[in-house]
Amino acid sequence: SSRVYMKSAILERDEKQFDAALRLIEAGLKSYPKSPKLYMMGGQICSDSLPKEKANLERARKFYQRGLQQCPNNAVLWTLASRLEERASTFDSARSADAASGATKARSLLELARLKNPKSPELWLEAIRLERRNGNQKLAESLMAKALQENPSSGALLAESILTAPR
């Protein structure tokens, strides 16, 4: 099962054998292309464990893009892909740290995710937090209002709304 590939890749990753882990993930994806965790692991290994180089950023992007094509309803996959885009500027030392560009790409990715999964409170919450991390308080409040209209019974959104409400 895909779980065997995943656990084997985790073992290789823990042993710092990143190439072996990625080979196992690719082999697992050939047999189980609808397994979102394998795409997540591939993207995370490329973005977090390998050196912060442009080639590894592209490898991580490809894992997430392939995963989103196969599993478009997986909120965690969308979230990881948007976070990768948000911090993409840390991968390119030749370019000045352009966080605004990363936030723009992350924002558009989350917008697409919410169009495909409008009833996913996790995606709304990630979009709200992205705006807060980038200092767009008004936009975050506007998104929160829309999110609560779309998902009125979401405990996570209600909790976030209460925690971030002005006192």
Segments the model singles out, each with a brief description of its role:
Residues 1-167:
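Alpha-helical solenoid scaffolds in eukaryotic macromolecular assemblies
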